[in-house]
């Protein structure tokens, strides 16, 4: 149902996986030929399904877009870092900007969104459920304060093998957020 209020899109590549070539210096690079191929993949996806948004690559770590309907990016930060990061992203996000694009390509009218975010310590080991709740609220509050941020995708709904940043534990049991101390019955 393409009229659903949630955003559904085809994401062709995630975090440049398989798109970069290792050079003689050992560094990965995203070659112009590969960028052109990704653009053709975008065109094909739009041809096959014109009802959906298409994202060429959901970038992180210095990657970027070639041809996309969504100017998205991945970012995992502690709550206190979000304001400065989003201030910078908003300042660099406008038609004609090359921020978050590769090969000299420029942004058009694509909306900006964080397509992968969560609590950074979830990847290194849990600092505790209460800290998870604090950073989660700080992050979401900053997204709401920045009007150019059209949306976000939280990773993930439940804890998995090496990522402890879900809303609930891997066994789907509730996490203790400490909010029950403020509002009885709320975890």
Regions found by a protein language model. Name each.
Residues 181-187:
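Surface beta-strand/loop "capping" patches
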Residues 1-173:
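Substrate-binding/catalytic cleft of secreted carbohydrate-active enzymes
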Residues 177-179:
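C-terminal domain-tail junction helix/linker
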